[in-house]
């Protein structure tokens, strides 16, 4: 780690340029056009608004299945534009689509208004079709298994873009027969009333594939492929209104959240420097790099940021801090053991790497599974979490190491500059396992009893929000335009008091005096009370009427199923990874048992305090799972390390207690740093942000409790207490020593 003066100066300049460059990029972006800047980040409907389009169903008395299928296919169509869009039923025959960050309603109308029907016609069918007569298509969109856009780089055509089609088995047979019967003739491919391709058949095509060629742009080909894959919309939709709407959570949500984040970040840095000194300074610099990199990537990859997405970033910051805490705790332990600072730094990074990689990879696996199988807010959360994970590993194991070496070689070599290790007596955590497990069981039982009582009283077991159960929408056209602040601070409290409810979402139509308020389902008396109370204080425009209607949940049954499936699969994937890394099913089972406890205890909190359960509920639960699994892996990693040095006289109970105690500082400090950010959001945030941050605060505390008091106890009870665990560890070490002494064995 010896550097000459030239290298010191060079590294200093590189790090300084990196910090300044990333900071300027995060603020101003690149190319002088704001590309990659934080200001260029797409914000969701909850934070920035977007376009709202309402369609009327043309068919009379459509079935609920057709409506649900239509909503699902609209969701899939707009998913490529934004994972944070909402589609829901309004009244009996209307469907509303809301897409964040869009200012051109006509563009969306064109995209979504496409029915999506695909037909293959021979010349006879084409002639009848073009004259408006009855015809029988050779194939339809239902015969297509999948469709993908492509670019033919070998083509000399000015339009080398197309869509490759793969037929179903039945569709392939139909296409083979159709081409065999039309050699020398054309087959017309008709999509939504327009001929998109009419190739001449040279021979029978039996491979089950076909292509639509000569598309004008790749985007056009990609959109067509998407619509073909999804299939046609079963109902005919007529657009009745389209508006640009403001943020659902209001302007203050962003402003106050940014202030809270800035204060929280500053306090976090002060805490790290106070506790870890020189490494704390390194952590502060790495967190600045981490934050700017994450914001840059979110902006560059055009991700839409909503409250669930912010949850993913908060978890990412927590994991970035956690990685630093793990390393610096290890460094202090090595210094306390008598090693030089230089060797302690090297050993600290070496010993911390496996725990950091395991914790982040486990969470990254979960994020990938959630992204693949999740929809809507789950996918948005998974995206920001994955980005944060990758950046966290990079900054912790690469950036901080470079900065740490640099500071050491600049003369910061005194052991006191790297913090002081507090020698704790070993706490006998396992001796109180019956009490800690009993506390968890009692809390979980309280939750189930509360939900049962609520159901018996005619209420829902949990206080499901509009996203899950729908409700009512009430629209007022006022005699003047009110600001977002006036709507939030003056009008919404009147609605809450008149209806006796807590959850009210608002949408302000831009350049209009019309404001819509979404609430839980209101009775006739509640609607009349709201109308009377609001119009008494805030007069409406002459000749206008107060519009009221029912709305369905924006989280469809399919999205709910996908969310549950994705969480289950993510948990299984984490279990498999933990088993593969630790080679012990007891570790995996203990981790999953602790995660289940975390989720159920937080659900108890939701049930007892009637906190609204909406889109952020899913993100909250996933954040807690990610945080808890990280803490669990740290302790398990320490148990595994101690088992490697165990001997025949080692007491397994003392070993486990020692592992828990030695990682206690890390668990406490990581919990404090994560809570700093969340508590500031709760103190300064608007109501919706408070409802989002409070369960996270509870979940982080519950995660700390389970990591310290439950996971190792579960492992111990599942068989870790058996003498065979020590014997197996001793035999493995002896075998490894034998191999090292005698050379390779055949």
Where are these regions (language model features)?
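A structural signal for conserved, well-ordered secondary-structure elements
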Residues: 1-746
């Amino acid at each position: 780690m010896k550097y000459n003066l030239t290298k010191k100066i060079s590294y200093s300049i590189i790090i300084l340029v990196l910090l300044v460059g990333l900071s300027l990029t995060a603020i101003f972006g690149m190319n002088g056009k704001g590309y990659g800047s934080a200001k260029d980040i797409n914000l969701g409907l909850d934070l920035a608004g977007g376009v709202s389009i309402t369609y009327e169903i043309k068919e009379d008395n459509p079935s609920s299945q057709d409506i649900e299928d239509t909503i699902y296919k609209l969701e899939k169509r707009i998913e490529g534009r934004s994972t944070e869009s909402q589609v829901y039923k309004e009244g009996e025959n209307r469907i509303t689509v809301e897409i964040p960050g869009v200012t051109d309603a006509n563009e969306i109308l064109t995209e979504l208004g496409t029915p999506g029907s695909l037909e293959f016609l021979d010349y006879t069918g084409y002639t009848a079709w073009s004259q408006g007569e009855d015809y029988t298509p050779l194939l339809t969109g239902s015969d297509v298994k999948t469709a993908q856009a492509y670019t033919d780089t070998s083509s000399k055509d000015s339009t080398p873009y197309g869509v490759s089609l793969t037929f179903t088995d039945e569709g392939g047979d139909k296409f083979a027969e159709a081409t065999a019967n039309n050699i020398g003739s054309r087959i017309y491919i008709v999509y939504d009333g327009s001929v998109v391709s009419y190739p001449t058949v040279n021979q029978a095509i039996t491979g089950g594939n076909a292509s639509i060629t000569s598309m004008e742009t790749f985007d056009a080909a990609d959109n067509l492929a998407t619509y073909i894959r999804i299939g046609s919309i079963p109902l005919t939709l007529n657009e009745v209104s389209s508006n640009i709407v403001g943020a659902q959570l209001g302007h203050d949500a962003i402003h106050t959240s940014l202030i809270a984040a800035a204060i929280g970040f500053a306090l976090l840095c002060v805490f790290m420097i106070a506790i870890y000194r020189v490494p704390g300074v390194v952590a502060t610099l790495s967190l600045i790099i981490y934050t700017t990199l994450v914001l840059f990537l979110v902006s560059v990859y055009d991700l839409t940021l909503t409250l669930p997405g912010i949850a993913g970033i908060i978890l990412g910051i927590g994991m970035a801090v956690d990685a630093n805490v793990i390393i610096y705790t290890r460094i202090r332990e090595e210094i306390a053991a008598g090693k030089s600072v230089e060797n302690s730094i090297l050993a600290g990074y070496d010993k911390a790497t496996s725990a950091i990689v395991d914790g982040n990879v486990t969470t990254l696996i979960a994020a990938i599974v959630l992204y693949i199988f999740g929809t809507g807010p789950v996918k948005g959360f998974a995206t920001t979490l994955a980005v944060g994970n990758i950046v966290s590993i990079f900054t912790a194991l690469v950036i901080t190491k470079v900065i740490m070496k640099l500071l050491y070689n600049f003369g910061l070599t005194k052991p006191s500059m790297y913090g002081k290790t507090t020698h704790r007596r070993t706490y006998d955590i396992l001796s109180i396992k019956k009490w800690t497990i009993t506390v968890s069981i009692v809390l979980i039982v309280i939750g189930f009893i509360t939900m049962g009582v609520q159901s018996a009283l005619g209420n829902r077991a949990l206080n499901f929000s509009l996203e899950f159960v729908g409700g009512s929408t009430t629209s007022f056209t006022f005699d003047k335009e009110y600001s977002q602040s006036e709507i939030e601070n003056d009008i919404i409290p009147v609605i809450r008091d008149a209806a006796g409810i807590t959850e009210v979402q608002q949408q302000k139509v831009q350049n209009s005096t019309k404001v819509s308020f979404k609430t839980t389902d209101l009775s006739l008396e509640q609607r009349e009370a709201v109308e009377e109370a609001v119009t008494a204080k805030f007069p409406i425009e002459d000749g206008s009427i107060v519009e009221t209607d029912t709305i369905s949940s924006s989280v469809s049954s399919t999205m709910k199923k996908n969310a549950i499936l994705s969480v289950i699969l993510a948990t299984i994937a984490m279990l498999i990874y933990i088993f593969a890394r630790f080679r012990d099913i007891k570790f995996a089972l203990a981790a999953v048992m602790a995660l289940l406890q975390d989720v159920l205890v937080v659900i108890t909190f939701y049930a007892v305090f009637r906190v609204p359960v909406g889109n952020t509920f899913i993100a909250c639960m996933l954040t807690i799972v990610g945080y808890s699994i990280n803490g669990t892996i740290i302790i398990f990693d320490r148990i595994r390390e101690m088992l490697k040095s165990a001997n025949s006289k080692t007491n397994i109970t003392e070993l486990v207690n020692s592992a828990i105690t030695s990682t206690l500082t890390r668990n406490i400090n990581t919990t404090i740093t994560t809570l700093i950010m969340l508590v500031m959001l709760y103190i300064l945030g608007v109501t919706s942000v408070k409802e989002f941050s409070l369960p996270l605060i509870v979940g982080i505390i519950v995660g700390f409790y389970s990591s310290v008091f439950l996971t190792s106890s579960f492992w111990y009870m599942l068989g870790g207490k058996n003498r065979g665990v020590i014997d197996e560890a001793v035999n493995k070490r002896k075998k490894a020593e034998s191999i090292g002494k005698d050379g390779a064995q055949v």
